[in-house]
Amino acid sequence: MTGPVVVPYGPHADQFLELTLPAGAGPAPVVVVLHGGFWRAAHGVELARPLAADLAGAGWAAVAVEYRRVGAGGGWPATVEDVAAALDALPGLPDAGRLDLSGVTVVGHSAGGHLAAWAAGRGRLPAGAPGAGPRVPVTAAVLQAGVLDLRRAARRRLGARAVQAFLGGGPRRRARRYALADPVRLLPTGAEVLCVHGTGDDVVPPGQSERYAAAAAAAGDRVEVRTVPGGHMGLVDPAGEAWALVRDWLERRRDGRGGRTTLEP
């Protein structure tokens, strides 16, 4: 395992990614890790680093992404534009020959789960929308306690009105922004999806995963929902049960054993 190598994808101090390569010389499957924190500047890429290191140690090329956040130059559309730019930068990385870009997996927790689901649905964005026209196909997404129905999250004022802060207002005032940013509105994505949620999560309710998964399955996407004991932050513990479940799912896909669709835990 080598790295992480820090690569800027834009001029802002928060526009960078960290690439960690697995041992070996051949192309490796790529997993992009998007951290959470309700899109706010208080939390950063340090939340993604342990998961990226674990993935690289298990044979994936891991990419931890930092992006502009609310309170530090982010919000709509800068935050989603950064995620799109980081993904689109992958073919131009110095070690791009070590990356199998035929199908990229995105993993995200909380607001990072929103960004991962949004990245998977970028292909459905209209021309000219922030993030439209992806260069790299996202073929799988792991959504860990994701904020996946932004309108519902806004109505429930999750994260002390974090969605409103991210999008600059509520669904009535910012209807077009919600239409372009809300993962549940960007279906089907064509990506295979795993939603993981803690049964005791009092930060992002499990209903966020359940509603998104039901809509994705109805649209024809392959989706699996798994619930685990515990709360919100346990999902990003690389030694925890929830992450072991994610690793197993990723390994099944890598070995050609994916393709399940179930909405049962």
Annotate each language-model stretch with its function.
Residues A42-A52, V63-G103:
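Catalytic nucleophile-loop/oxyanion-hole region of alpha/beta-hydrolase
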Residues C195-H197, D201:
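Short beta-strand/loop motif that positions the catalytic acidic residue
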Residues T20, E210-P265:
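C-terminal catalytic histidine-bearing segment of alpha/beta-hydrolase fold enzymes
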Residues D202-R211:
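Conserved alpha/beta-hydrolase "acid-adjacent" motif
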Residues D88-R156:
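Primarily recognizes the serine-hydrolase "nucleophile elbow" in alpha/beta-hydrolase
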Residues M1-A25:
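N-terminal cap/lid segment of alpha/beta-hydrolase-fold proteins
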Residues A23-D54:
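Short, surface-exposed "cap/lid" segments of acyl-processing enzymes
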Residues H12, R152-R185:
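Mobile cap/lid helix-loop segments that gate and shape the active-site cleft of serine hydrolases
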